[in-house]
Amino acid sequence: GGGGRYPGGGGGGRGGGRYSGGGGRGGGGGRGGRGGGGRKCCS
């Protein structure tokens, strides 16, 4: 996990994939970002 980006409002945090729109959840065993309605992008 780690190395992921979370653009958008309430973004941030660490994750395996990239998420846009309110941060969303993390992946790859990393920690998810804060915020709801997150979309998985450019995984």
UniProtKB/Swiss-Prot annotation:
<dbReference type="GO" id="GO:0005576">
    <property type="term" value="C:extracellular region"/>
</dbReference>
<comment type="function">
    <text>Responsible for plasticity of the cell wall (Potential). Might play a role in wound healing and plant disease resistance.</text>
</comment>
<dbReference type="GO" id="GO:0071555">
    <property type="term" value="P:cell wall organization"/>
</dbReference>
<feature type="region of interest" description="Disordered">
    <location>
        <begin position="1"/>
        <end position="43"/>
    </location>
</feature>
<keyword id="KW-0677">Repeat</keyword>
<protein>
    <recommendedName>
        <fullName>Glycine-rich cell wall structural protein</fullName>
    </recommendedName>
</protein>
<keyword id="KW-0134">Cell wall</keyword>
<keyword id="KW-0964">Secreted</keyword>
<keyword id="KW-0961">Cell wall biogenesis/degradation</keyword>
